[in-house]
């Protein structure tokens, strides 16, 4: 697989959130989880919901649960199966998912799985911009400390270990999970640099670290800027919500119960 690998140009995908186009990486990554969450949350008027209020936290967490249920079911290498991007990112589908959110009660069960541990981090994020508006949004992770622990001879770097994120169970019995291991296939992975453009022009280059926290963090940065009127420094410094307990795309079959 390594000898046959060739880099490729990946077209980012976007949704419009209250007049702002938010751009993320498509599967085999998880960038569209942030876009799905924004589509769901766009149906709520956050100009009337205080930042950090119980209602703000509740709506954010419920949107995350719904998006991550799809993350576990559909996000995988598109070269090995159809990923229904247009459907997942449609406003119509977001409206259907939004209708599942109760204003005063948490979703008690969303199938399936559990998230990865987030207490220890192995990711770095960097962004830079020049006076002409050229931006770089860069994220890198070996996955779990020293990655695979293997260094190609004479090259001076260690290979990452994202293959751990393949599904291994049930892959030889149908129907197989879309993220099942196969030769030449890319595993689901979590690293997602992002951009925001406005009226076709660059506005913000951003990203966060932390596995399943990344789409949650992206959504909160966008909401802080667009909904809560924060400047860039405030949006980055503001306290963040992190929800654990949603479905996971790497083979765990235990459903989320009791609202995560």
Which residue ranges define each predicted feature?
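Internal maturation/activation junctions in enzymes
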Residues: 43-142, 151-155, 162-163, 170-171
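Alpha-helical support elements that line or immediately flank enzyme active sites
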Residues: 39, 208-233
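Active-site rim segments in enzyme catalytic domains, especially the processed small/beta chain
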Residues: 134-204, 228, 232-233
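Long, well-ordered, tryptophan-enriched scaffold segments
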Residues: 1-27
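Short, small/polar residue-rich loop motifs at catalytic or cofactor-binding pockets
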Residues: 9, 120-123, 189-191
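Extended C-terminal subregions enriched in glycine
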Residues: 132, 184-185, 218, 227-260
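Glycine-rich phosphate/pyrophosphate-binding beta-alpha loops
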Residues: 23-31, 124-127, 139-150, 208-215
């Amino acid at each position: 697989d390594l000898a046959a690998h060739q880099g490729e140009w990946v077209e980012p995908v976007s949704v419009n959130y209250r007049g702002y186009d938010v751009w993320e990486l498509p599967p085999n990554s998880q960038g569209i989880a942030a876009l799905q969450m924004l589509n769901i949350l766009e149906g709520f008027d956050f100009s009337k919901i205080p930042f950090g209020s119980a209602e703000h936290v509740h709506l954010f967490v419920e949107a995350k649960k719904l998006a991550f249920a799809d993350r576990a079911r559909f996000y995988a290498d598109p070269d090995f199966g159809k990923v229904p991007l247009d459907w997942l990112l449609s406003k119509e589908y977001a409206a259907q998912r939004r209708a599942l959110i109760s204003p005063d009660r948490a979703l008690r069960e969303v199938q399936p799985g559990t998230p990865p541990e987030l207490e220890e981090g192995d990711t770095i994020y960097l962004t830079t911009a020049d006076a002409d508006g050229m931006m770089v949004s860069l994220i890198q992770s070996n996955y779990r400390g020293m990655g695979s622990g293997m260094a190609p001879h004479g090259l001076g770097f260690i290979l990452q270990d994202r293959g751990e994120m393949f599904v291994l169970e049930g892959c030889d019995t149908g129907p197989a999970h879309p993220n099942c291991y196969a030769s030449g296939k890319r595993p689901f992975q979590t690293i997602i640099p992002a951009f925001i453009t406005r009226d076709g022009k660059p506005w913000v280059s951003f990203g966060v670290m932390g596995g399943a926290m990344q789409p949650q963090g992206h959504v909160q940065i966008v909401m802080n800027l667009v909904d809560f009127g924060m400047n860039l420094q405030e949006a980055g410094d503001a306290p963040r919500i992190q929800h654990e307990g949603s479905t996971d795309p790497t083979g765990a079959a235990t459903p989320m119960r009791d609202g995560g």
